[in-house]
């Protein structure tokens, strides 16, 4: 799971390295308490670079704070896959009741 997580103070270049290592084109952004506060994709990184945001900048201005997620307790795999396909989504994290990634 660690390869999918970055914190809000992570630099853009470090987040990009995680995206490259996990080979999934996204990361889940967590706060100091380990709760998910957003997601970030390789596309978000590209758009930041095109806006001349420095690679050393932290991701706080870049990641998506309004994100869709599945609740672990209510997860139905078929419905989840159908939702992703219907909404042309490549990814949505699964969070527990404390909003921690699982």
Q: Residues of each region from the PLM?
A:
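The conserved cystathionine-beta-synthase
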Residues: 5-24, 30, 49, 70-89, ...
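Bateman (tandem CBS) regulatory domains
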Residues: 1-4, 57-67
């Amino acid at each position: 799971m660690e390869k999918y997580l970055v914190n809000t103070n992570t630099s853009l270049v470090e987040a990009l390295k995680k995206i490259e290592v996990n080979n999934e084109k996204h990361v889940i952004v967590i706060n100091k308490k380990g709760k998910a506060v957003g997601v970030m994709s390789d596309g978000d990184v590209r758009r930041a670079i095109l806006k001349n945001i420095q690679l050393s900048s932290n991701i706080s201005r870049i990641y998506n704070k309004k994100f869709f997620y599945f609740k672990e307790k209510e997860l139905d795999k078929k419905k989840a896959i159908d939702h992703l396909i219907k909404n042309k989504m490549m990814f949505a994290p699964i969070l527990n009741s404390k909003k921690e990634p699982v």
